[in-house]
Regions:
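Active-site pocket-lining/capping segments in soluble small-molecule metabolic enzymes
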Residues: 1-147, 154-272, 276-369
Length: 369
């Protein structure tokens, strides 16, 4: 059975939607965990405060209680790469952080997601609350799972999206995690990456060159104005890059609803569905697709369009520049998961390999979409 952690927008209707979907997919798939944070603690999280909900402690406590009564665990995100902007500022706020952790534990928060190991050190001085390592930390080696588990008692990891199609890494990581009672979680609908066309006309793409810089900006920007400065750096750059060619999107590290079985086959059944700043309508749309392992439509609608962050447009109303019929991608991931697999990070995209380009040319550009 597939299990899901879902982004929480703190809408009461989201809990109702989860309850209905859990009943609909009972025995096959279940949402078991929510994740999110609030604007008053923007210094701790990987999202600027203007994108986060604001609420008082009474509301938060009531929401956690309702979720807990439904059997949902709440995961509070303290996943800033550098909380408070520097090590010294972080140290200056150490007691404040620790007091907040103790309060979160008191009201029923089950787990905290971190991206900075120093946060684990602070938390472990006062609490044995469950911890998760964020995908922002980009765990790049199998042995890192062991280190974080043994040193800090961390029992859950969101896998680096760079590794989403690395069969050998995932197989070995899943083996270690399953043998040691650790949850290995895959971020399903993340399309981060950059792309271009070289001087010879070869289109290429790669894991996002802006990713760490992006999360530093998220963590330190305070207002929408700050986020939009310097041509909406960095998101303005990666958005335009991905739209350079249709096949750029195929080169990103997404996992379709239908592809989950490939991960099940190597021992992974826990998936993260992002979108905590999205609408309940959008989150319900995403949950239904993944829990049902079936999706009809444009692949790109599985990800919250970055453009909607600043425009306020509803996700499902957004007009994408590229249409990639999801069902045309059946079998697409076989290149990475059949036989010995394929590791894009070890090759020059567009030169050593043109698989995505050829696939797009054959199945996408010529489809009736």
């Amino acid at each position: 059975m597939n299990l899901y952690k879902v982004g929480c927008n703190f809408d009461w209707k989201l809990l109702d939607a989860i309850q209905e979907l859990n009943e609909k997919y009972k025995g096959k798939a279940q949402v078991v965990e929510l994740f999110g944070s609030d604007s008053d603690h923007e210094e701790l999280t990987a999202r600027p405060g203007w994108r986060l909900p604001k609420f008082d402690q009474n509301f938060f406590e009531a929401y956690i209680k309702k979720a807990k009564d439904m059997g949902l665990k709440f995961n509070y995100t303290m996943n800033s790469i550098q909380p408070y902007g520097s090590k010294m500022n972080m140290i200056a706020h150490k007691k404040e952080i620790q007091d907040y952790v103790k309060w979160l534990e008191e009201i029923g928060v089950y787990r905290i997601t971190i991206a900075n190991p120093m946060m684990a050190m602070f938390i472990r001085e006062v609490s044995n609350i469950e911890l998760e390592i964020s995908c922002i930390s980009h765990i790049d080696t199998v042995t890192q799972f062991k280190y974080f588990h043994e040193q800090f008692g961390i029992n859950k990891f969101c896998c680096s999206i760079l590794k989403n199609r690395n069969k050998e890494f995932l197989t070995r990581a899943a083996k270690y995690c399953n043998e040691h009672g650790i949850i290995l979680e895959m971020l399903a609908q993340e399309f981060c990456g950059v792309a271009g066309v070289d001087e010879n006309g070869n289109p290429y793409a790669t894991h996002c060159a802006f990713r760490d810089s992006c999360y530093l900006c998220h963590a330190t920007n305070r207002t929408k104005f700050e986020s939009m400065e310097y041509h909406n750096y960095p998101m303005g750059f990666c958005m335009s890059a991905r739209n350079s060619t249709p096949e750029s999107w195929l080169r990103m590290r997404w996992i379709r609803p239908e592809d989950q079985k490939l991960y099940n086959s190597i021992g992974i059944n826990y998936f993260k569905l992002s979108g905590r700043t999205g609408t309940t309508e959008y989150l319900t749309y995403i949950m239904d697709a993944y829990m049902g392992e079936n999706f009809e439509g444009n692949l790109l609608t599985l990800w919250k369009p970055l453009e909607t962050i600043t425009t306020g447009e509803k996700e499902l109303s957004h007009k994408h520049l590229v249409n990639i019929p999801n069902k045309k991608l059946d079998g697409f991931l076989d290149k990475w998961f059949k036989g010995d697999g394929w590791e894009c990070e070890n090759h020059m995209c567009g030169e050593d390999c043109k698989y995505c380009y050829e696939f797009t040319k054959k199945y996408i550009n010529n489809s009736d979409n």
